[in-house]
Regions:
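Hydrophobic ligand-binding cavity/cleft-lining segments
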Residues: 2-67, 121, 153
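Intrinsic-disorder/low-complexity, polar/charged segments enriched in Ser/Thr/Lys/Arg/Asp/Glu/Gln
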Residues: 19-27, 69-71, 84-86, 109-111, ...
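Hydrophobic/aromatic beta-strand elements that line small-molecule binding cavities or substrate pockets
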Residues: 24-26, 55-57, 85-91, 111-118
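Solvent-exposed residues in well-ordered beta-strands and their adjoining turns
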Residues: 27-31, 75-79, 90-92, 103, ...
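Hydrophobic pocket/interface hotspot
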Residues: 35-39, 45, 72, 89, ...
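Short amphipathic alpha-helical signal-transduction/dimerization elements
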Residues: 43, 151, 155, 159-166
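Glycine-rich portal/gate segments that line the openings of hydrophobic small-molecule binding cavities
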Residues: 57-103, 157-161
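Beta-strand/loop substructures that line and gate deep hydrophobic ligand-binding cavities in soluble
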Residues: 99-153
Length: 167
């Protein structure tokens, strides 16, 4: 299921009603723990994530049991446009959730989360949600359609990667 303009109730940032949003829930033929590990392996994103050209983890801190918090810089590029943004990434293994909180870069706001639900030992349901608003109207006009198209391919890129890694 792919739905535009909606996300989980109560989870939107202030002003999110006008922000571009994308959400999808997909059933995959891989274990939830495997899919969590794949998405949590952010250093590998440049190998397969649309628009991602570089990703550097600046900081990695273990918190509560099974919870790790990263500060990461992601560089996205399309043609002549190249932008880097910094996010706080909370990897919550016990709850099978990944929360991405925007810290700095070309956005006014951005929020993103992943939720992994086991269906069986070999099947899981993955929820992906993102909403964002560029700081610059010009950049938003240039990159908005490109980002929309990339996010539609995002979940597929992770599914293809899982098929390759867990085959």
């Amino acid at each position: 299921m792919i739905s535009l303009g909606c996300g989980p109730p109560g989870k939107r940032a202030a002003g999110a009603e006008r922000m571009p949003q994308f959400s999808t829930t997909r059933r995959v033929r891989h274990a939830a723990a495997d899919m969590f590990a794949l998405v949590a392996d952010v250093e590998r994103y440049p190998e397969f994530v649309p628009l991602c050209r570089e990703l550097k983890v600046r900081r990695r801190v273990a918190q509560a049991e099974g919870v790790e918090v990263l500060t990461a810089d992601m560089t996205v590029a399309y043609k002549m446009i190249r932008e880097t943004f910094t996010s706080k990434v909370t990897l919550d293994r016990p709850r099978m959730r990944i929360l991405v909180e925007y810290l700095n870069g070309p956005f006014r706001q951005m929020e993103n989360h992943w939720i992994f639900r086991p269906i069986s030992e070999e099947t899981s349901e993955i929820e992906f949600f993102i909403s964002y608003e560029f700081r610059s109207r010009m950049l938003g006009a240039l990159m908005g359609a490109v980002f929309d198209a990339a996010f539609r391919k995002f979940a597929e890129a992770f599914e293809r990667r899982a098929d390759l890694v867990f085959a």
